[in-house]
Amino acid sequence: MVDTKTPGDKTLTMPTKTLTLKPRVEQGVVRQSFSHGRSKQVVVEKRGKRRLGGDEPAAPAAPEVAKKPAPAPAAPPRQQQSRPAPQQSRSGMVLRTLTEDERTARATALADARVREIEERKQAEIEAQRRAEQEKIEKAEREAAEARRKAEEERHRQEDEAKRKAETEAKKRFGDAEPAKKPAETSTTTTTAAPARPATTTTRTPTPAGRPPAVAAEAGDDDEAPRMIRRPGGPARPAPPPKQPAAKPGASKQRGRLTVVTALNADDVRERSIASFRRRTQRLKGHASNEPKEKLVREVVIPEVIAIQELANRMSERAVDVIRLLMKQGAMHKITDVIDADTAQLIAEELGHTVKRVAASDVEEGLFDVVDDSTDTEPRSPVVTVMGHVDHGKTSLLDALRHANVVSGEAGGITQHIGAYQVTSPESGKKITFIDTPGHAAFTAMRARGAKVTDIVVLVVAADDGVMPQTIEAINHAKAAGVPIIVAINKIDKPDAKPDRVRTDLLQHNVQVESMGGDVVDVEVSAKNKINLDKLLEMIALQAEILELKTNTQRPAEGTVIEAKLDRGRGPVATVLVQRGTLRVGDIIVAGAEMGRVRALISDQGETVQEAGPSVPVEVLGFNGPPEAGDRLAVVENEARARQITDYRAHQKREKSAASVSGMRGSLEQMMTQLKTSGRKEFPLIVKADVQGSLEAILGSLEKLGTDEVAARILHAGVGGISESDVTLAEGFNAVILGFSVRANKEAAAAAKRNGIEIRYYNIIYDLVDDIKKAMSGLLAPTLRETMLGNAQILEIFNISKVGKVAGCRVTDGTVERGANVRLIRDNVVVHEGKLSTLKRFKDEVKEVVAGQECGMAFENYTDMRAGDIIECYRVETIQRSL
């Protein structure tokens, strides 16, 4: 296109002749020669590089371009013709004049282009300067390499010269012919090899037409033999091959269409297989597979004790390395040895791992979560524990509230089991849970357990009896649990009832009732005549409203085992008070060292229920074994977690029992030493009871009976009937079997009768404790008491044949009896203790001599008596002791 740049003419014309561009390409044919006489011709195109500006390399192409008709000189004539005849170019466009904005934009673009050009020129100058510096550095490196090469060649030349001189010297000295032949052969070979080089060079000189010399040289170098270099004054030696850059893995395995590079390198003629390439890679790598691998850093979980093998496995290390580190610390171990957590942590940290310490007790974490009171929105029934002294009417009061008769079912009319019941208040209709506890001294643990799970304590005090020891203990339990107390003064229907005396006695123990100006509620009741029972329930309900008891029934159940027993028909049965959540049939539960799945829930009325909410007492069936009374019950998500917890607790229980047994029994030497020094005797017993609470009370009472001289040794204690294994155990230790509210089965009774094992049955704990106390008292060593009889003074010593020396004495006070024990005192020092063998008055043997009379005395096996000695006569009495 040609712009006339005439303001008046707005037409643009196109030249009629077509413009063409000649491709700047030079073609040639390259002939390639291969082994076995094969050859190949390849067409090679050489494309010229377009040069910008007036560069010098573009000058040779100028003649060719000049031969073509240039469109630039022809343009002015066309423009001149088009001006007078604008009608010929009918296809032209009418152009408008440029506006001011367009001119400004064009000027701005031109200015930007100039600035960009200046910047590019500066950048090119910087690049050229950097390239010049780089070439200078490379040139210096080449010169240094050349100097090193020349020094190396000089050194080799001197070595060869020294070797040749040594060979010449050896030939002169020994005159051998063979050493002379070898240099001749060497020189012949050198001479032959010397002209070989020009021939080879002559062969390589002609190159195919159009092929660059460099390409021909490369092709020739592949087929030629190694070149020999001959220096003046030295033998010919092969020249070192030129250093080539190391080929990258996979570079020799190029496939695809034919290009200039592939044609020159002849890669498409003979290619290496994949297996060959792999073998080459392995050879290049060498022993890279034996290099140390990257170290893995792990988080190692370390329990309280861990075996070395297990520690090595958790760290992914070799056990040998772990043992080596332990040896450096001065400890010799085997792979199966167990080390403590501190040592294991040192080893793991030294090997670069991170350590997470865990304890065996961590399995119990999260079992009893901290209760979030914000979720407790539903009201629950209060739990009321009835406490007081024995025979103050606790169970009778509860029977009157429940309209039941529990007292008649207890042996001896005293409560020996803990019971839980629910009563509906007649006034408000709300349910109240009552827990009945034993009152006598043996059941302290039961009372403490009842106080821990309760909200309110009802302290029952008999109006005719007043405050008693167990009443004081119940007050202390309630204060320790931090629960409010309601005093129920019972038996006000008796004629000798004194309620005011009870209130006054309670003041001594910091229990101040409302009538005395305090804040403790007191109610006068009569369980026998059912007086003021509704008022007692009303006070309990009022106290419960003040406490604002709330719960969340949707959370997993938690509770406390109040009582546990082994029922012959139903298996292990536990009385559980649910404290939080809801316990349902099918839940997996854990209590102490026992676990199980809830098979059935039985209410206090004997009815089977499907679930039990908060503050509801139920009997739970489904435990693997009877749990301990007082254990906390929890619902877990699966059997694996339950088994993990119970295994840990059972292990702890075994360790504790083993420690107590070993501490009590010790080794054989310790037992013998103990018998020699203290003479402590043991009374072996096997105790079986109906429920866990009674067993606990019996064991506590028997433990209190022990003294420094005699103690009860409990070989086995359990819940359930007496079995044949119990009899076998008793036979081995010659023990007595005690059954409390249980009986022996047929096989156990027959085995006991056959082996002579005594089995005693009891229904009242007092009788059991009294009998054991008497039996243990029989093991006590009796007490020896000395009773003075009289004194006698020796007047004269007589020698009598066939008898020996006889002392003539006068009894000064008391009496002297034959056969009694005597002491011989000389100068207020006892010189002999023995027995009186002879007592005569005149010539007759007498039984005793009274004060003021004279007699003759002789001692058993002692004759050194002198006149003036004092004889003291006394009698030793044996008195049986009791606990």
Swiss-Prot record:
GO terms under cellular component: cytosol
Chain segments carrying region G4: 490-493
G5: annotated segments: 526-528
Residue spans of biased composition, Basic and acidic residues class: 113-184
Residues holding GTP: 388-395, 436-440, 490-493
PROSITE patterns: G_TR_2, IF2
Keywords of this entry: Cytoplasm, GTP-binding, Initiation factor, Nucleotide-binding, Protein biosynthesis
UniProt keyword annotation of GTP-binding present: yes
Protein name: Translation initiation factor IF-2
Organism: Rhodopseudomonas palustris (strain ATCC BAA-98 / CGA009)
